[in-house]
Design a protein with these regions (language model features):
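Acidic catalytic/metal-coordinating carboxylates
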Residues: 30-34, 58-63
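Charged docking surfaces used in two-component/phosphorelay signaling
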Residues: 13-21
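Receiver (REC) domain active-site loop signature in two-component systems and cognate sites
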Residues: 55
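C-terminal output helix
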Residues: 99-112, 119-121
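Acidic, metal-coordinating helix/loop segments flanking the phosphotransfer/catalytic sites
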Residues: 28-48
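CheY-like receiver
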Residues: 114-159
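Hydrophobic/aromatic residues positioned on beta-strands within the core alpha/beta folds
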Residues: 77-80
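Active-site residues of response regulator receiver
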Residues: 52
Length: 159
């Protein structure tokens, strides 16, 4: 099963059609916040999150960073129409938009087959991850609130 998060209806529609034609079950989210709510309530298996990097409320970058801390085994594939803006950060595999059926399916298969996700973090990410775990740490009575984790992430100073 794949979770596809994008604020563009047309991208979700096309992505769903391409993925379903390849045999994938697809959940859709209109932005990162909705994706977090879906992830927080999902009880079944999820193989991959595909997320637009630039979305309102919670961006795909924030979604990927929170998942790299709290669900490190879950692969994330970023999609964007602004490829030049993300070339400096190579921790997340990126598929440029617009994509073809072939390029999407190839990226999905690579991500799932190779367990591609945010690569091992650099020191800054480790510091942020440690602080994020402290702020949003779960207990036996309270599971991780992924939405609160993004809010905490936004409050963590960089550097």
């Amino acid at each position: 099963m794949v979770l596809l998060a994008d604020d563009e209806d047309a991208i979700r529609w096309v992505g769903r059609r391409f993925l379903e034609a390849d045999g994938w079950a697809v959940l859709e989210a209109t932005d990162g916040l909705e994706a977090l709510h879906i992830l927080g309530s999902l009880t079944g298996r999820l193989d991959l999150v595909i997320t637009d990097l630039n979305m309102p409320r919670v961006s795909g970058r924030e979604l990927a960073e929170v998942l790299s801390v709290f669900r490190p085994g879950l692969p994330v594939l970023g999609i964007t129409g602004f490829l030049s803006a993300v070339t400096h950060d190579r921790r997340l595999p990126i598929l440029p938009k617009p994509f073809t059926a072939g390029s999407l399916i190839q990226a999905v298969r690579m991500a799932c087959g190779l367990s591609v996700r945010l690569r091992p973090p650099v020191m800054e990410h480790r510091r942020r991850a440690r602080r994020l775990r402290e702020i949003a740490s779960p207990s036996a009575e309270r599971p991780v609130d992924l939405v609160a984790a993004v809010q905490a992430l936004r409050g963590i100073e960089v550097g």
